[in-house]
A protein has these predicted regions:
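N-terminal leader/targeting and accessory segments in enzymes
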Residues: 1-92, 96, 238-241, 290, ...
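Nucleotide phosphate-binding/pyrophosphate-handling subdomain across enzymes
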Residues: 3-4, 16-24, 132, 265-367
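Phosphate-binding loop of NTP-binding sites
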Residues: 3-4, 22-23, 58-62, 71-224, ...
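Residues in the short beta-alpha loop(s) of Rossmann-like NAD(P)-binding domains
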Residues: 11, 34, 139, 225-226, ...
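Residue-level detector of alpha-helix initiation sites
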Residues: 12, 74, 113-117, 275, ...
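Short internal beta-strands
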Residues: 27-33, 220-224, 346-347, 366-375
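Short beta-strand "acidic-cap" motif of Rossmann-like dinucleotide-binding folds
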Residues: 28-32, 134-135, 164, 416
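C-terminal helical cap/extension that packs against the catalytic core
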Residues: 40-42, 357-412
Length: 445
């Protein structure tokens, strides 16, 4: 009798897991409480995988031998309470991928902020150096989908291949044996605490799961000057020697790793936080024996991911930057810190109980004017309204761009870094960023 695998969730992660499980010969069923996107409907139907949407049929779920849970499904959901009560083993998609990945090198990257940029940069450096590398996880393709692709094309599944994976705390919650050869922990700041009983310690421990299966000879690289990492750090019991990155790695516009210095003045990364992201990526490339000349070439040619301090255009002497991914105060702190010119700051959206006080010194020093973009801007007015700076409210990207243009002078920067979620006016942060960019280009056309 075939092993029955039930997948909860039908997005990139769930569908990738379902397709891999079907290829492995399992009896597979996909259940999603929401709607199944057309793209994934087609993939599931073509593979002959039964699925349901907008409901969870418990009789079809609780007869599973094993359940693969998509990372967005909380443990407190009704379906997970029922699954746990039944005692069914639960794993995540990256655990399934790891079981069947064969010989390879896995680089796993986590942190509250900077995961995507560091993942993309690490991948870019390794690819520029000519290594056999793929990227995925929480960005791009699911790990399971990439493993399936290797199983379907055995000639590419060589032992020298490298997977660079962005992994979230939600994904790490559901690993059992997943073991990266190189693990990176960039930072920890309070986020997603509703999933962790509002406990920062629980959230931090979820992040530290990235190294829980590592052994002697593996590498665990972490931020050695992050106070929350320091507070909750526990030395691994496996003989693994953690490798902290200390302050002082970035001096006079260059980064030193080993005996090599890498010039950061010629690339497209801005801000101290991105210098830290860069040193992490360089460390990985160095460990994997990438040619230093090629590492420098990769640093020179890398373009930051969309919506992350993304330069939109320079018009009339004003630089427009899209940092729509700045959905929390910590991200926006780094964005403002990276500004070298007087800044018109577009901020606001769906507030997540933000404390804006850490931004105050930067706003006082760097911001010329504040443009609120949201349905309810009361907390932003409360935080910054007493400053001797213009502050206006707008209700759309087009209106915010028009208002910002009125304040900006040649040599200034207009920065969209909202410090808030996007769901009051936009579908998501990508929609917010693209509407902003469209409005900027229309204004300057």
């Amino acid at each position: 009798m075939k092993k029955r695998i039930v997948i909860l969730g039908s997005g990139e992660s769930g569908t990738g897991a379902a397709l891999l499980a079907r290829h492995l010969g399992y009896d597979v069923f996909v259940s999603d409480k929401g709607a199944v996107q057309e793209k994934y409907r087609k993939e599931l139907d073509e593979a002959g995988i039964p699925w349901e949407e907008k409901t969870h049929t418990m009789d079809l779920i609780l007869n599973a031998d094993e359940i693969i849970k998509s990372p967005g499904i909380p443990e407190k959901s009704d379906v997970m309470k029922a699954v746990r009560a039944r005692g069914i083993n639960v794993i995540g998609e990256i655990e399934l991928g790891y079981r069947h990945a064969g010989k390879c090198t896995i680089v796993a990257i986590t942190g509250t902020n900077g995961k995507t940029t560091t993942t993309e940069l690490t991948f870019h450096l390794l690819r520029t150096a000519g290594l056999n590398v793929r990227k995925g996880g929480n960005v791009g393709n699911s790990f399971a989908a990439m493993v399936l692709d290797d199983l379907l094309h055995p000639s590419q599944a060589t032992a020298d291949r490298i997977f660079v994976l962005e992994v979230s705390s939600f994904q790490l919650d559901d690993i059992q044996q997943f073991r990266p050869r190189i693990a990176l922990l960039l930072n920890i700041t309070p986020d997603h605490l509703d999933r962790y009983d509002y406990s920062l310690g629980n959230y931090a421990r979820a992040k530290f799961r990235i190294c829980m299966n590592q052994k002697r000879g593996d590498k665990f690289i972490y931020n050695g000057f992050d106070p929350i990492i320091a507070e909750f750090f526990e030395a691994p019991a496996s003989g693994l020697k953690p490798a902290p990155i200390r302050k002082g790695f970035f001096k006079n516009g260059s980064i030193r790793v080993g005996v090599n210095r890498f010039d950061m003045k010629t690339g497209n990364l801005r801000g101290p936080h991105n210098m830290f992201n860069a040193v992490c990526a360089i460390r990985v490339a160095h460990l994997l024996k990438a040619d230093p000349v090629k590492i420098q070439e990769g640093l020179n040619t890398f373009m930051p991911p969309e919506h992350r301090l993304e330069k939109v255009t320079v018009a009339g002497g004003v630089t427009w930057i899209n940092d729509s991914k700045g959905t929390n105060v910590d991200s926006t702190f780094y964005a403002l810190q990276a500004m070298d010119e007087p800044t018109v700051w577009i901020v606001g959206g769906q507030d997540k109980g933000n404390d804006y006080s850490p931004l105050m010194p930067l706003v006082k020093k760097k911001v010329r004017a504040i443009v609120c973009m949201g349905l309810d801007n009361s907390k932003i007015r409360e935080a910054f309204g007493s400053l001797d700076k213009p502050l206006v409210e707008t209700g759309s990207a087009a209106a915010a761009v028009k208002a910002a243009a009125g304040f900006a002078r040649p040599g200034d920067t207009v920065l969209l870094s909202p410090a808030c979620a996007s769901f009051d006016l936009f579908l998501n942060y990508e929609d917010r960023g693209r509407q902003f960019k469209s409005a900027v280009m229309k204004l300057n056309s």
